């Protein structure tokens, strides 16, 4: 695993990422895809959002908070993230999902592994959080 040194999603000239999942939901009035980029950042802290017009970046993991070489599990509510980032509900279900790692703007190295990506409709809970104390 490797994160691109010098990358920073908050700087358009250095916006490479260690790893990202893009979820494209809608298009804007010009027909450009409206996407959320869930990213593992080399520099920005978890919770950072960046606005590149129809592309919204949301940092869900960061080099500062979590080490390399460890599987990281994330659960996101894409509809709620969309509402917060774009200011309204999506008109459609996701049209595309893309996994990505890049280092071209900083001429570095980015290596990422993805596994077990699952999209669910409706309210869900992680199985480990659904049992009450008397059910165990």
Predicted feature residues:
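Extracellular beta-strand elements of beta-rich domains used
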Residues: 97, 115-119
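Extracellular carbohydrate recognition and processing domains
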Residues: 33-86
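Short, charged low-complexity linker/loop segments at the C-terminal edge of domains
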Residues: 122-129
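Secretory/extracellular carbohydrate-interaction modules
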Residues: 1-43
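Residue-level signal for short segments within beta-strands and strand-turn junctions
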Residues: 23-27, 101, 121
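Compositionally biased, proline/threonine/alanine/serine-rich low-complexity intrinsically disordered stretches
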Residues: 129-136
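Extracellular beta-strand ligand-recognition surfaces/modules
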Residues: 18-21, 68-108
């Amino acid at each position: 695993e490797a994160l691109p040194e010098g990358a920073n999603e908050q700087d358009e000239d250095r916006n490479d990422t260690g790893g990202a999942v893009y979820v494209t939901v809608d298009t804007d009035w010009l027909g450009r895809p409206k996407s959320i980029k869930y990213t593992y950042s080399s520099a920005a802290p978890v919770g950072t959002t960046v606005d590149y017009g129809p592309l919204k970046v949301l940092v869900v993991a960061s080099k500062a908070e979590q080490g390399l070489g460890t599987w990281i599990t994330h659960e996101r509510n894409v509809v709620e993230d969309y509402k917060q980032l774009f200011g309204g509900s999506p008109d459609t279900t996701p049209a595309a999902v893309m996994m990505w790692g890049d280092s071209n703007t900083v001429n570095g190295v980015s290596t990422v592994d993805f596994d077990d990506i699952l999209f669910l409709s409706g309210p869900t809970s992680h199985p480990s959080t659904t049992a009450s104390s008397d059910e165990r």
